[in-house]
Amino acid sequence: MIIGVSGIQGDFREHKWMIEKLGHESYVVRTPEDLEKVDGLIIPGGESTTMIRIMKRIGLFEKLKEKILNGLPVYGTCAGLIVLAKEIENYPQESLGVIDIKVMRNAYGRQVDSFDEMVEIKGFNKPFKAIFIRAPRVDGWGPEVDVLSTLDNHPIMLRQKNVLVTSFHPELTDDTRVHEYFIKMVEEYRK
């Protein structure tokens, strides 16, 4: 099983290391053809408008959307959440629209406002240290979206079928449980 990490822009190396720490092969995805080599894909934190612009320029945007709609498991953190979201409230930009959520970019402040918080996640036996860096806030979600964790009454981890998103950065911790959760999603997809 190979877990892809989008290497277009952002903190992809940290996700790659996390996947390898769990004993799985990782692959940095930079072209539409690379999608054929992976069983699941992580879209990291970074700058969502830059990611989308580059994805469109190299032909990855439409190919990725097609693969996700056909069942490819995908996990987006922070900017990756924005890239996957159906609607961005405070900034007009295109997105893949594959998870029925409405988000506000940078809702938790600027870089200097970064923080971490111990949060409860559905199915986890103890709290998880969630790190928020210029994080988006989810302000609305559809009936098919499962809220897995919240902070101050706003979802911070959600899943809709084969799409998982977090507004925080689990790859910046030593705790592998969120990545393990995604790997289980990929294993289910491969069956």
Curated annotation (Swiss-Prot):
The keyword Oxidoreductase does not apply. This is Pyridoxal 5'-phosphate synthase subunit PdxT. Gene3D superfamilies: 3.40.50.880. One of its GO terms (molecular function) is pyridoxal 5'-phosphate synthase (glutamine hydrolysing) activity. One of its GO terms (biological process) is glutamine catabolic process. The active site is at residues 78, 169, 171. CDD domains: GATase1_PB. Catalyzes the hydrolysis of glutamine to glutamate and ammonia as part of the biosynthesis of pyridoxal 5'-phosphate. The resulting ammonia molecule is channeled to the active site of PdxS. Pathway: Cofactor biosynthesis; pyridoxal 5'-phosphate biosynthesis. Its EC number is 4.3.3.6, 3.5.1.2. GO terms for cellular component: cytosol; glutaminase complex. L-glutamine binds at residues 46-48, 105, 133-134. Keywords: Glutamine amidotransferase, Hydrolase, Lyase, Pyridoxal phosphate. Belongs to the glutaminase PdxT/SNO family.
